[in-house]
């Protein structure tokens, strides 16, 4: 079997604890894992199949969010799960640190493209109280995230559903874009300009009129079209 982006160098950071409660973890530990990706592993993309509840006074600007801001400010792409609290229990917020403006935040959809019932709704305001605008409304998109077949323990196969599953599809597609356009990768002197360019290309690849839905985002992942929206000559 071959994954979406077989040529990547994959780094794994233990951000959660296997404690019998769905691998929960502290924000501090998640923040430490993100900073390891930034400073030790020197990642181009950080894929976060995790998230915390949106406490207006804590999680939205807690350690994990601060570490994520540090990553994107350095030009590192961050892709994060929108969260799985959709339906009647939806609090109206994507999970942290997916609430950070320049993060690509991913909801889940089924094989027919229908938004998964548990995929979290996005909020209209950012953490500073400003109205979110193109291309940073949350979530930005949906990707396959229902009954996803993958490998498990002891040479077993298993299926799972959630925005965490959807996140890795987007991270893989983004890895292929950086492979085709290595000039987009962070280089130690990077700003957020390349992230902004790639996010605009993402939205334009799905939705030419940039209409946004609070659960589906700007549309469904179209990896080839996303790549096609990246200009041949890049200045960022």
Can you name each region flagged by the protein language model?
Residues 15, 34-58, 81-82, 181, ...:
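Short acidic, glycine-rich surface-loop motifs adjacent to enzyme active sites
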Residues 60-78:
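Catalytic-core regions built around general acid/base machinery
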Residues 3, 9-14, 38, 44-49, ...:
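Structural recognition of the beta-strand scaffold that forms the well-ordered cores
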Residues 95-179, 225:
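Extracellular S/T/G-rich loop segment that most often corresponds to the catalytic His/Ser-adjacent loop
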Residues 83, 223-236:
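Secreted peptidase-domain scaffold signal
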Residues 1-26, 41-44, 73, 99-103, ...:
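Subtilisin-like serine protease catalytic core
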Residues 16-19, 51-55, 84-88, 109-113, ...:
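Solvent-exposed loop/turn segments at secondary-structure junctions
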Residues 64, 90-94, 118:
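Short beta-alpha junctions and helix-cap segments that line functional grooves
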């Amino acid at each position: 079997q071959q994954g979406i982006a077989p040529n990547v160098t994959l780094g794994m950071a233990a951000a959660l604890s296997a404690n019998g409660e769905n691998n929960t973890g502290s924000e501090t530990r998640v923040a430490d894992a993100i900073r390891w990706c930034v400073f030790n592993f020197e990642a181009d993309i950080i894929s976060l199949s995790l998230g915390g509840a949106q406490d207006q006074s804590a999680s939205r600007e807690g350690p994990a969010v601060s570490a994520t801001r540090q990553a994107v400010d350095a030009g590192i792409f961050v892709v994060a799960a929108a969260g799985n609290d959709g339906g009647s229990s939806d609090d109206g917020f994507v999970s942290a640190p997916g609430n950070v403006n320049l993060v690509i935040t991913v909801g889940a959809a089924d094989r027919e493209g229908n938004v998964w019932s548990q995929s979290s709704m996005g909020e209209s305001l950012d953490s500073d109280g400003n109205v979110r605008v193109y291309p940073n409304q949350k979530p930005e998109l949906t990707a396959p995230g229902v009954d996803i077949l993958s490998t498990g323990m002891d040479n077993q196969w298993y299926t799972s559903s959630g925005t965490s599953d959807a996140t890795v599809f987007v991270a893989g597609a983004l890895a292929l874009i950086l492979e085709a356009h290595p000039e987009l990768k962070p280089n130690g002197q990077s700003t957020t300009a390349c992230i902004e360019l790639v996010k605009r290309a993402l939205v334009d690849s799905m939705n030419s009129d940039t209409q946004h839905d609070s659960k589906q985002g700007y549309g469904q992942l179209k990896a080839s079209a996303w790549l096609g929206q990246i200009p041949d000559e890049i200045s960022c």
